[in-house]
Amino acid sequence: MATKEGKAIGIDLGTTYSCVGVWQNDRVEIIPNDQGNRTTPSYVAFTDTERLIGDAAKNQVAMNPQNTVFDAKRLIGRRFSDSSVQNDMKLWPFKVGGSPCDKPMIVVNYKGEEKKFSAEEISSMVLVKMREVAEAFLGHAVKNAVVTVPAYFNDSQRQATKDAGAISGLNVLRIINEPTAAAIAYGLDKKASRKGEQNVLIFDLGGGTFDVSILTIEEGIFEVKATAGDTHLGGEDFDNRMVNHFVSEFKRKNKKDISGNARALRRLRTACERAKRTLSSTAQTTIEIDSLYEGIDFYATITRARFEEMNMDLFRKCMEPVEKCLRDAKIDKSQVHEVVLVGGSTRIPKVHQLLQDFFNGKELCKSINPDEAVAYGAAVQAAILSGQGDEKVQDLLLLDVTPLSLGLETAGGVMTVLIPRNTTIPTKKEQIFSTYSDNQPGVLIQVFEGERARTKDNNLLGKFELTGIPPAPRGVPQVNVCFDIDANGILNVSAEDKTAGVKNKITITNDKGRLSKEEIEKMVKDAERYKAEDEEVKKKVEAKNSLENYAYNMRNTIKDEKIGGKLSPDEKQKIEKAVEDAIQWLEGNQMAEVDEFEDKQKELEGICNPIIAKMYQGAAGPGGDVPMGADMPAAGAGPKIEEVD
């Protein structure tokens, strides 16, 4: 199986950065991208000519803020009317619109046309990029992957992430929780030195999400005891506070409001992100942005103390899930053997300090790389699930939990829980319900997730009707409802009337915002089309480069006395004119088609090559070897650099 399918990879699909790993040669390799970076920005940009993903997209964001999309993870699996989506929209430079089924759609301009994308499609583009990074490294096509999600992601967010995988053309072997993946990285790292059962708390604070999980690890068994978190808290929120602070400072100093200018805000945000990172290692830093707004330069200093003060409520908010998680796991904080830090935002000294104080001064574990631990664990799980691991990992067993209670609505809008939160998955629970009134012909099964006593305060996942119940007094019919959660944390619900044998079932996939099979197929086709367009752009650039290279090489070759001196003035002029014509043509036709570049190069070669070849034959004498030295202009060789008037 391992050979036919190629290797399976592990992808940490992050809010701000993503990372990919693979199990190879008895260990995990975290794979660098084409820029040499081991993490890739989760950014997709659309321009008049092309689509950019990753570093290329993030690097041009200040020039093109309206059409550069990021934070898709803060939209995925959420409804447009969700308050967090509405709040985020105020901060994003790109436009998000609603749709008839309350699904947020990202609106951008691509090649001069308005296009709408779902969060799943944007995430799928990032997944494709991560797959390509892995394929370039492994040298073969990759089909199978394990993709991670925050432990506190709900059912619809998980399903939407799985759909993103399908659109990207990946076969998602499993959706696993980020803290659990990080625990695998920690567990393998510490495997040799440990005996007996260990309680480990994973504190995962990333760019956009926050999770806390408690696991017991023993002999390769990773059992999650409890999980808690906030799917909308992370490094970006700390950046936002700093951006707001400097916007008001700019207003105070210059009496001008930059909050309506997307480009100025983006440049400020980039500077704030950099300043935040610097403040993790120094006590004070400066922000310097030339001509930020209406020609005004902006210089400001910020101290670590000021940064901590403006985010203090958010830092404290990070401690609440830690307490909740310990309570749910029924573990006292003194019984936690190791506190493991994951996610880039755990580098913030104040977060360290608060966590250390909470655990009464206990040393925190910093032995695993906070940016790569999740992808590392996902790669291990991918190897196990695809049967490619070795004895080192084969005996690993992951027992994860469902983060939110699941149940259905009974008379009076009461939430009746079938599966309490922190139940180990996969799991299956059945319960018998009955009718509420005499001769009731059917029952409406409404499935909710959440911890509140009334369903109106919880999240509706989906509903379906079980009809065809024979007339009977209330309380007589027996309706058996079965909740079944698979290993991805995705729920199936079925209901059956025991007496009449009527059955109905639903895969709870948040019917409202869920993509249908047809929509996913259409998006897969779109994705293939965009990929083909990207390839086309790449070919154009290569053809243009090839022609440019050849023309400049030729120009330099005839300037070289050793060669130019051997040409007759006529021949020299002929080549010079042809080269100048080609360079002129290039300047006016940057956007030409591939075949135009190729024809132009053939035309130029047709003029130059015979003259150069003749010269070499003359130089070599009859029967002599043709010297192919450094002087011969090879297409693709770097030009000689000299002053050209």
Swiss-Prot record:
Record's compositionally biased regions (Low complexity): 627-639
GO molecular function: ATP binding; ATP hydrolysis activity; ATP-dependent protein folding chaperone; heat shock protein binding; protein folding chaperone
UniProtKB keywords: ATP-binding, Nucleotide-binding, Stress response
The keyword RNA-binding is annotated on this UniProt entry: no
Keyword ATP-binding appears in the UniProt entry: yes
CC per GO annotation: cytoplasm
GO BP, sorted A to Z: chaperone cofactor-dependent protein refolding; protein refolding
Classification via InterPro entries: ATPase_NBD, Heat_shock_70_CS, HSP70_C_sf, HSP70_peptide-bd_sf, Hsp_70_fam
Domain of life: Eukaryota
Chain positions covered by the region annotation Disordered: 620-645
Family: Belongs to the heat shock protein 70 family.
Name the record gives this protein: Heat shock 70 kDa protein
Lineage: Eukaryota, Viridiplantae, Streptophyta, Embryophyta, Tracheophyta
